[in-house]
């Protein structure tokens, strides 16, 4: 009987830990993107406004950017098991990216959307 009541409690504890893990990863990613001394290569973070002005429609460069960002994030965030990086918008003064993240010990994907505006990254809610 004791085992049954313990099993009923475990999913809730796991759910709270998963929620906490997701919030922690999102917070750490936003900090990583906005840190003046970010571990991410500067072109991937602060170099974006200059890149957008000249190459916003270059599909090869957009693909390169996504690959480089994916590689850097996987290197710097060990809690990510799988990651897909997509450009949602690439305009003159706005860049929007979407990160589809699978975390270790989490069965549901996490979508993390960011937009570059006015010199910094901001989190947006997925649509």
Curated annotation (Swiss-Prot):
Q: Name one GO biological process term.
A: cellular response to oxidative stress
Predominant place of localization: cytoplasm
Matching HAMAP family = IraD
The GO cellular component terms are: cytoplasm
Q: Look up keyword Cytoplasm and say if it applies.
A: yes
Q: What is this protein called?
A: Anti-adapter protein IraD
Q: Which parts of the chain span the membrane according to its record?
A: none
Which superkingdom? Bacteria
Instruction: Check the record and name the Pfam families matching this protein.
Output: GPW_gp25
Subunit relationships: Interacts with RssB.
* UniProt record similarity statement: Belongs to the GpW/Gp25 family. IraD subfamily.
Protein task = Inhibits RpoS proteolysis by regulating RssB activity, thereby increasing the stability of the sigma stress factor RpoS during oxidative stress. Its effect on RpoS stability is due to its interaction with RssB, which probably blocks the interaction of RssB with RpoS, and the consequent delivery of the RssB-RpoS complex to the ClpXP protein degradation pathway.
Q: Any idea which UniProt keywords this protein has?
A: Cytoplasm, Stress response
Localization of this protein: Cytoplasm
- Which GO terms fall under molecular function for this chain's record? anti-sigma factor antagonist activity
Concerning InterPro entries, the annotation shows: Anti-adapt_IraD (IPR023776), IraD/Gp25-like (IPR007048)
The yes or no answer to whether the keyword DNA damage is present is no
